[in-house]
């Protein structure tokens, strides 16, 4: 699909296929003053209206009004762009309202992408997807973090269009058969070896609260005082949302 910025700042989406012979109209991101097919030269304005047909006399059957690029339903939320090839899809607002309600305090629209990272995983996509919808696998797959992650204490919420899993950090796994001190948990969370010095935990604080306080101050330089709006769970816990098919943990 093509997502095209309009002169008024809005967005439109079109199938990335020429209406003449189906060739891909654009092969990469960029800037352009028109949408021109590299095969035979058919061209459209950025608003989707037909602009040019080379040797137009050979196409008397084409009516300009009926040869615009078909628009795909498009909506935006918090800086994200959503499209749906189904012209009869459900309205966007009720589709996103459950997820949007979870992020009312986060002002996602003011954020920017600092880095884009991609990795190809040699597995069925559903396996990778499901692995991030639970923490049950931590005991066997990531045993090194059991001292600081309450894997089987996860809370899983399922709504109509989205789901959430919250796995508490700064607390040991219930599967461990031994007790941990706050210092043990802090070492595990900060990856500090036993022989190395550890910052003392302030009186009246446990390891979880201390880690949240340190993390909050570490984020302050980039995020500003908004970090004071976030509770310890939002700072320390693993909170993963799935909005099918748009967002994945």
Regions found by a protein language model. Give the residues of each.
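Rieske [2Fe-2S] iron-sulfur-binding domain
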Residues: 1-105
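C-terminal catalytic domain of Rieske-type non-heme iron oxygenases
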Residues: 75, 80-249
